[in-house]
């Protein structure tokens, strides 16, 4: 589901290249289905952040965000009265009632992890899993599931490692935002690409609060970060090329 959420972020940019409204809506519907099917609520929040961020950095942002919020408020009462709608509400993050034990586990994980982190505050510990607090988190499968990437980083590498981890992505986000200013026109394709990358990165940073950095997840967020760096470099090259072109035009004899 996390990979599908990232695909949603990319689709925010790619959809403008699809001229058929039917195909555009079908693509959005397929992505929505793929996002909903695993019933993993963390990527749902991440996808929502992507959409809000993308709209918020575009034209008529305030008006469109108000319309989006109004539509969401209207949708909840409608779901409550349609057949099967209550089941959907129960699955929603923050307001749903399904998997309450999952929320309890996450709360215990935060509480116990903070105790362990305080013992090795600056540089973390390689054997944090053997501590009594972490051993008490062993689940039925015999594993300790650290379902929060930031906590996992802090446990392994301490506050210094966590600051470097967060600072890396914050620097890239600021670089993307700065690069977007090189394209002042709201309908510029390059600016829209920056909006999509910034929204996708923000969504990922929210999603990894709820998931472990296992399998392809680190590959995804490092890859998106790399795309952000490439976008910032592209904007700088274009700006230098435009500056050089302007100077050469001024130096041409009349």
Task: Map each language-model feature to its residues.
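Membrane-interfacial segments
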Residues: 14-18, 61, 176-184, 214, ...
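Membrane-interface micro-motifs in multi-pass membrane enzymes
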Residues: 1-4, 40-42, 154-158, 210, ...
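Transmembrane alpha-helices of multi-pass, membrane-embedded glycan-processing enzymes
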Residues: 2, 151, 155, 161-174
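Long extracytoplasmic/lumenal interhelical loops at the membrane interface
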Residues: 84, 89-157, 178-185
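Alpha-helical transmembrane segments of multi-pass inner-membrane proteins
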Residues: 1-57, 69-73, 173-181, 202-204, ...
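Transmembrane alpha-helices of multi-pass inner-membrane enzymes
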Residues: 69, 171, 197-254
């Amino acid at each position: 589901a996390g990979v599908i959420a990232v695909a949603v972020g990319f689709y925010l940019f790619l959809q403008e290249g699809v001229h058929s409204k039917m195909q555009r809506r079908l693509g959005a519907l397929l992505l929505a289905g793929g996002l909903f099917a695993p019933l993993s609520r963390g990527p749902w929040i991440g996808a929502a952040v992507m959409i809000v961020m993308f709209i918020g950095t575009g034209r008529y942002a305030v008006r469109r965000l108000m319309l989006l919020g109004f539509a969401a408020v209207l949708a909840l009462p409608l779901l409550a009265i349609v057949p099967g709608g209550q089941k959907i509400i129960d699955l929603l993050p923050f307001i749903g009632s399904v998997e309450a034990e999952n929320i309890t586990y996450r709360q215990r994980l935060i509480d116990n992890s903070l105790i362990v982190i305080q013992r090795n505050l600056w540089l973390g510990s390689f054997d944090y899993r053997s501590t009594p607090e972490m051993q008490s988190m062993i689940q039925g499968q015999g594993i300790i599931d650290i379902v929060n990437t930031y906590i996992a980083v802090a446990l392994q590498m301490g506050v210094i490692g966590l600051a470097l981890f967060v600072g890396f992505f914050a620097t890239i986000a600021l670089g993307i935002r700065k690069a977007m200013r090189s394209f002042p026109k709201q309908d510029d394709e390059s600016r829209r690409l920056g909006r999509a990358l910034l929204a996708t990165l923000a969504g990922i940073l929210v999603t990894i609060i709820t998931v472990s950095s296992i399998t392809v997840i680190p590959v995804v967020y490092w890859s998106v970060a790399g795309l952000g760096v490439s976008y910032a470099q592209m904007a700088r090259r274009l700006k230098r090329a435009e500056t050089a072109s302007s100077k050469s035009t001024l130096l041409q004899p009349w």
